[in-house]
Amino acid sequence: MAGHSKWANIKHRKERQDAKKGKIFTKLIRELTVAAKQGGGVPADNPRLRLAVDKALTANMTRDTIDRAIARGVGSNDADNMVELSYEGYAPSGVAIIVEAMTDNRNRTAAEVRHAFSKCGGNLGTDGSVAYMFERKGQISFAPGVDEEALMDAALEAGADDVVVNDDGSIDVFTTFADFISVNEALTAAGFKGDEAEVTMIPSTTATLDLETAQKVLKLIDMLEDLDDVQNVYSNADIPDDVMAQLG
């Protein structure tokens, strides 16, 4: 299957993400702590924690910081107060948005998310209003230059659902939610370590955006991502390459 990474193009402007590294670390530490609290502090026995550690290392978090976050989850009551919530709504032009948050104060988080939607011309919806448009899947991404045929063979052998070769030569391997850990580990064992591996929400249909709409939608997504309690933001926006280039 070929494509232009339409599912991944919302991960835009990597340099901006790098500039927010402190906030990214805060989100990663929270995930490490809660994962350790729920499933134990040994990554080998805790798939969620194992994935969180991999993501933290990919983000260049030090092993010492990772270990402290895990220890906090195992030995502290702080994580007991954290709950995982999701919000659903629409950005301008009816683009579907799902927000995943981790918080110790439901009211604060709900108010902040609602404010972001309202300020950016969107609408916060009810549970189920857009979730039916998405499917939770695993996504393992490889930069251009990987051996396409060998990776495809290894991915299908490992039980992947789909392998997408993007126009720029990068490759995305998609799995079911249940098979994500086993496929990712099988690929790593076969010599294919993804540049990024995560559980994500893949839209069943996408909305192609022009420049003006893309600017409005990304403004909302950026505002949501900047909220301390928000862990992930997903949308069904498909931003064409020429529009993405104009966004800078």
From Swiss-Prot:
Q: Which GO terms describe its cellular component?
A: cytosol
Q: Does the keyword Hydrolase apply?
A: no
The GO annotation for biological process reads: regulation of DNA-templated transcription
Cleaved signal peptide residues: none
Pfam families for this protein: TACO1_YebC_N (PF20772), Transcrip_reg (PF01709)
Keywords of the record, alphabetical order, are: Cytoplasm, DNA-binding, Transcription, Transcription regulation
Main localization, broad class: cytoplasm
Single GO term (MF): DNA binding
Top-rank taxon of the source lineage equals Bacteria
Q: Where in the cell is it found?
A: Cytoplasm
**InterPro entries referenced in this protein's UniProt entry, alphabetically:** Integrase-like_N, TACO1_YebC-like_2nd/3rd_dom, TACO1_YebC_N, Transcrip_reg_TACO1-like, Transcrip_reg_TACO1-like_dom3, YebC-like
Entry similarity comment: Belongs to the TACO1 family.
Q: Which HAMAP family match?
A: Transcrip_reg_TACO1
Provide the protein name: Probable transcriptional regulatory protein PSPA7_4544
Could you tell me which species this protein originates from?
Pseudomonas paraeruginosa (strain DSM 24068 / PA7)
Source species taxonomy? Bacteria, Pseudomonadati, Pseudomonadota, Gammaproteobacteria, Pseudomonadales
